Amino acid sequence: MHNPILLTAICAVVSFFIGAIPFGLILGRVFNHTDIRKAGSGNIGTTNALRVAGPKVAALTLLLDCLKGAICVLIARPLIADLGHGFPVSIMAPGAAGDWMLGVICLAAVWGHIFSPYLNFHGGKGIAVGLGVILAWYWPIGLSLLGMFIVAVAITKFVSVGSLAAAIGLPIAACAVFPYSSLGLKFCMALIGITVVWAHRANIKKLMTGKESKLSFTKRVTEPDDQ
């Protein structure tokens, strides 16, 4: 297939549906016979899986959500490289003609997770799947954002603060590291950051009112959080 727009659209749709797989919900039901949407924040991501179902389910959720994001990029990369634009398959050099294509793939996977069609277009908050796509897209930026996340959580004890820091840092890092990348790529990275911040709107409200829960590896919750 040599039509870049059609190929990107097909890869984006596939990535959206892969990104939409609700591993947190599936693992909670398999290992704990629990619907993690019924307690805590009601989210299907790693943090709520930890709070409701425990460290094992949370670790597996984190791993699988990261992997599904990475897989979307790793599948699309050689297909896009085969278009004949001369992209190096190992890097897909941001700044090359067509670098926006992988940006669209990254965005589609994150949107699939946040707006999962399997859950009536509800889902997670995009952090783990976002980490997966960015590590697969350009791992130095992914590791930098992960480091930013870890430092922010270590200082504040709030996972949401680390998540927001990483989300805001993504478009900044992408523009700083690749100032000559296409406007399309920059736009996709900005949209990922904006969407992840939007997905944390309830957390932002809780942080402002002092109701946000701090990270705990031992405390379990069985009831929905107070909003």
Go through each PLM region and give its residues:
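Long C-terminal subdomains/extensions of small-metabolite kinases
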Residues: 130, 177-178, 185-186, 190-198, ...
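A cytosolic-side transmembrane-helix exit/cap motif
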Residues: 122, 146-150, 182-189, 206-213
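Alpha-helical transmembrane segments of multi-pass membrane proteins
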Residues: 15-18, 77, 108-113, 149-153, ...
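Alpha-helical transmembrane segments of multi-pass membrane proteins, especially transporters
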Residues: 12, 16, 61-65, 69, ...
